[in-house]
A protein has these predicted regions:
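C-terminal regulatory/interaction module of P-loop NTP-utilizing enzymes
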Residues: 1-344
C-alpha cells in the first residue's frame, strides 16, 4: 500500500502530520469562528500511559492493519465520524487515544453512553436552579437558601457561569486543529440517540436557546467547557471550524439507522492475534511479563476461538499471575479469563 497519503500512520510517535491534512471537501467545509484556543488543559494528554502502555516503545508498537489505517485516514480527510464495531477488548477506544497521541491533538474528549443518555448530555448543561438560587440571594429574596429576606444582596453572575459544554459541545468549538471525541458504546443508547445525532454531525453546529434569547444584549458569553476551561460563545451558537475526529464505538449489540451509517466511515475490528496481544502486554507490563505470560496469551487465543473474551482480561491475568505461586497460576487464569457470553 502506498503510504504517502496517510496522515495517521500508526507509528506511535508524535508528529505534525495533521498540518499536511488537505482542505475538506466543499460539503464538509465549516466556517465557525473566531478561532478558539483550547488551552493547556485540552493540550495535556493526561492518561496516555494508562491507555497505550507505560512501557511502549515506538519501534515495538503494533502497526495497525491496512484496513484500520485506511478507515482512520478516510475519516480525517472526509471530516466524517468513524464508527468502530467489535467485541469488548478489541481496542476500539484505544484508537482514539492513539490518534490523539500521534497527531498531537491533545486530550481525548470522552462521552460514555448509557441507556439514559440523551443528546443534551453531550452538547451542554444549563443549571437553571443554581442561577435561580443566586438571583434570590443577590436580591435578598425570601427563598434564598432558606434564609430571611435581606440576608444578602449583590450583582447576579452572568448566565455563562451556569452553562457547561459537554464533550460533543466542546469538540465542536471553532478550534484551528480538530479535537478528538470518543463516543463510547453508542449501541448502549436508547433508540432515539443515533437519530438525534444526525443533524449535529452533519451541520457541525448547535444552538444554545438560553444564550440566543439574550444575544441582543449579551452577544458574547463565556461558558465552561468539558476541559474545565472557559470559551466564548457568540450569538448563542457553537459552530466548528475544524470538524472533530469522532470515534463512535459499538459492541455490535444493535443495528443503527441507515441515515447514521451513511454519514460515517465504518470499521469492524476482529479479535487480536498473538503478535498484537504480546505487543499489548509488553506495552503495559514490560518485556519480562510478555515473556512469562506467553502461555496465558496462547490459552487466551484458544478460548477466543469459541468464547467471547476481552483483551483486558488477559492483562489482568498476566499481571496477577506474575505475583502468584505456580500452583495457583492456572486457577487464577481460569478465574480472570471467563467467557463473557455464557448463559446467566
Amino acid at each position: 500500500m502506498n503510504d504517502d497519503w496517510l496522515i495517521y500512520r500508526g507509528i506511535g510517535e508524535p508528529h505534525d502530520g495533521i498540518d499536511a491534512l488537505p482542505d475538506p471537501p466543499p460539503w464538509r467545509d465549516f466556517d465557525g469562528g473566531p478561532v478558539v484556543e483550547p488551552g493547556p488543559a485540552a493540550a495535556a494528554e493526561g492518561n496516555v500511559a494508562r491507555r497505550l502502555g507505560a512501557h511502549r516503545q515506538a519501534a515495538e508498537l503494533h502497526r495497525p492493519e491496512a484496513e484500520e489505517l485506511e478507515a482512520i485516514n478516510a475519516a480525517l480527510y472526509l471530516r466524517r465520524p468513524l464508527l468502530v464495531t467489535g467485541f469488548p477488548g478489541t481496542g476500539k477506544s484505544t484508537l482514539a487515544h492513539s490518534v490523539a497521541h500521534e497527531l498531537k491533538l491533545g486530550r481525548v474528549l470522552r462521552w460514555p453512553v448509557v441507556s439514559r443518555t440523551v443528546l443534551q448530555d453531550g452538547l451542554y448543561r444549563y443549571d437553571a436552579l443554581a442561577r435561580l438560587q443566586d438571583v434570590q440571594l443577590a436580591s435578598g429574596g425570601a427563598g434564598a437558601a432558606g434564609g430571611a429576606p435581606g440576608t444578602r444582596s449583590g450583582a447576579v453572575p452572568g448566565i455563562g457561569k451556569y452553562i457547561r459544554l459537554g464533550p460533543l459541545g466542546t469538540a465542536l468549538l471553532p478550534t484551528a486543529r480538530p479535537r478528538v471525541l470518543l463516543v463510547d458504546e453508542l449501541d448502549k443508547s436508547d433508540i432515539d440517540l443515533p437519530n438525534d445525532l444526525l443533524n449535529v454531525l452533519e451541520e457541525g453546529e448547535f444552538a444554545l436557546p438560553e444564550l440566543e434569547r439574550v444575544a441582543d444584549t449579551e452577544p458574547e458569553v463565556e461558558v465552561l467547557t468539558d476541559d474545565g476551561t472557559k470559551a466564548t460563545v457568540r450569538g448563542g451558537r457553537v459552530r466548528c471550524r475544524a470538524f472533530p475526529f469522532i470515534i463512535l464505538t459499538s459492541n455490535g449489540e444493535r443495528d443503527f439507522p441507515a441515515a447514521l451509517l451513511r454519514r460515517c466511515i465504518q470499521l469492524k475490528l476482529g479479535q487480536p492475534g498473538e503478535k498484537r496481544l504480546a505487543t499489548m502486554v509488553r506495552a503495559h507490563l514490560g518485556e519480562e511479563a510478555a515473556r512469562l505470560g506467553g502461555d496465558l496469551i496462547r490459552e487466551f487465543l484458544g478460548r477466543s476461538q469459541s468464547e467471547l473474551v476481552a483483551a483486558d482480561q488477559l492483562l489482568n491475568a498476566v499481571y496477577l499471575t506474575h505475583y502468584a505461586s505456580p500452583a495457583t497460576r492456572e486457577d487464577l487464569a481460569d478465574l480472570l479469563i471467563q467467557r463473557l457470553d455464557r448463559p446467566r
